[in-house]
Amino acid sequence: MAKIVVLGAGLSGLASAALLAQAGHEVTVLEKNNWLGGKSRRIELAGQRMDTGPALVTFPEVWQQFLDTFDSLGTARSKEHADLNFTKLKEVGRYYLRNHVTDLPVKPEHHWYKAWQQFSEEHDALTPAISKLLTSHPLDPSALPALGKMAKVYGLRLTTSSYIRSLAYMPQALKEVISIHTLNAGVSPNRTLALYASMTAAMASQGISVPVGGVNEIALALSRLAVAAGAKIELGVSVTSIGHRSVATENGSYGFYHLVSSLDPGVLKALQTGKPNRLAKHRSCSGVAIYAVLKESLPSDVVTHSVIMPDDADQLHSSLDKAVPPEQTMTFVNYYRAGEIYPNTKDTVAVLITAPADGKKHDLNSEWVRNELDRVSQKLGLKVAIDELFEAYEVLNPDYFAQFGAAGGALYGATTPLWQSGPFHNPQYHNPLRPRLWRVGASVHPGGGIPAVLGGTLIATRAMLRKIGKPKK
């Protein structure tokens, strides 16, 4: 039995703890905050609850694969402890771009339907391949057929932008709608693999889901699995330094044989070296996330997930790269009617504004935030600014997200050149020069949301168990 310390009780940390404890190892999770889930945090306003962080779940087969893996490793049964149900939304989202409005998947009556159908048919067949890559190491031989299928579609067009530009049959505005999804990795389509185009089609064909009760239910389910398997989870424990075989905290030290880090690489390095966490020159986007309880309902035609796009995406990406406020940005509006997802008695809304990772604190009247709120209100057809409908609200800024590690509040940390994608990604799950350290989380598997986080955990944990094995009974 190996003694393992897991740093961070976000989704990847909890998932790692559950699998490793289920395999028979002694696992302790250390979390500096007093809640489970990391960025996925449960808050309460005016007696109503909402969950921060990622709001939607795609590729449900990854969650099922995680549960199947958990069951295969030990005696605890996932069905007895996970207790997690999902509800599928009617559409992936409604997109607003200049004078265009469309749902994904595009409806038959829309003038983009023919182009969308062609695109969708070309990429639907890649959905199993994407799922395989989400849960497989890039050098895993079993992933080669999936990579081969993608190579046939993309050819030498490696980036999302180069591939989308090559689709002569597709209207320019629809190309922009598909390309905007690269912000799920925090960067522009010029800096992401063409895979992101296919992920849009896969999401549209499979649909997207929300856990009943909110996304934080995933963190709670993972914690129940971890505890059932024998892991210990300690909240409110701040790590002060990391040594060769122990972790120092404000409350004492924890020895380990192996260390699993879900922390941002900059934070991990600072704890290892004692040097300050520096602001990366190239980093992913951040956000100004506004969570509110509404005085009254939004119009009946407002869907659960709306995407308000900028008129000029290139200007947005340029501003984000320079870490300055954009003229217009991409904003998600997640609207939950009373009793729909959360057990609330009032409607709630999350207005999630893509922001530069500048580490700053903004409010509703910061000029660019104010402009964006007014633009969102106009696009949704509201008679007043959306914040005039707030009964109570809370704003989470880049300075808040910086507390989770990435300097400046970059949601996915520092970005890397395109050639460092896949097998060359840095940081890696495991570096032979640091044999006791393993990494999980968004920094080693950026983009792809919750499935990528869970998939990355499966990849890292499988490799770890191959190395250290399961304790003999």
Model segments located where?
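Active-site-proximal substrate-binding core of FAD-dependent oxidoreductases
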Residues: 466-473
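C-terminal segments that line or cap access tunnels to active or ligand-binding sites in enzymes
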Residues: 296-399
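Mid-domain catalytic core of redox enzymes
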Residues: 240-344
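A conserved FAD-binding loop/helix module that cradles the flavin
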Residues: 54, 442-465
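Helical element adjacent to the flavin cofactor pocket in flavoenzyme catalytic cores
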Residues: 198-243
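N-terminal glycine-rich phosphate/pyrophosphate-binding loop and immediately adjacent elements
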Residues: 2-128
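Rossmann-like flavin
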Residues: 96-192
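A glycine-rich dinucleotide-binding beta-alpha-beta segment and adjacent secondary-structure elements
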Residues: 173-185, 382-446
